Amino acid sequence: MRVAEVVRNTSETQIRVKLDLDGTGRQKLATGVPFLDHMLDQIARHGLVDLEVEAHGDTHIDDHHTVEDVGITLGQAVAKAIGDKKGIRRYGHAYVPLDEALSRVVIDFSGRPGLEFHVPFTRARIGTFDVDLSIEFFRGFVNHAGVTLHIDNLRGINAHHQLETVFKAFGRALRAAVELDERAAGQIPSTKGSL
């Protein structure tokens, strides 16, 4: 079973993430940031990851620390659950539309953290959610999961649709990358022999 639970406590946030990479998309989300819960639900459903996230943060100041630290803790949990990466497909990509919006996400479990985030948001906030925090979420994830991640919103007018397609595509790309390949069972997906 590829499951993990990670608890991360700082003076700003207390985060618990539990996940099963081979799940069915069940989720239990309570971050204190409703729009983040909505986006995490997209990862769970489209990634077929069972996901529990509980967070308590200094949201009376700003949502920044909570959103970033959830990304960090999710990255740590994915890295822990995936283990030595033997037998995984390693790469995943997805295109996802939502009405006028279309996004592409490509992920590589390379062991080399890198983020290319290109989303020309049409407004600064979705409700009360600051769209810049989405970059902090993915940067936290990338740095602690050890992945290279390319995120491109190819078109969109509605900022909610833009970001929702990003998170749905991320879930689907993640699902493809961590999927076990029977033909590569027990093998590290790299000519170097390690990732």
From Swiss-Prot:
One of its GO terms (molecular function) is imidazoleglycerol-phosphate dehydratase activity. Disulfide bonds: none annotated. Pfam families: IGPD. Pathway: Amino-acid biosynthesis; L-histidine biosynthesis; L-histidine from 5-phospho-alpha-D-ribose 1-diphosphate: step 6/9. Its EC number is 4.2.1.19. Its main location: cytoplasm. It is found in: Cytoplasm. CDD domains: IGPD. It catalyses: D-erythro-1-(imidazol-4-yl)glycerol 3-phosphate = 3-(imidazol-4-yl)-2-oxopropyl phosphate + H2O. Transmembrane segments: none annotated. GO terms for biological process: L-histidine biosynthetic process. HAMAP family: HisB. Belongs to the imidazoleglycerol-phosphate dehydratase family. This is Imidazoleglycerol-phosphate dehydratase. It comes from Burkholderia multivorans (strain ATCC 17616 / 249).
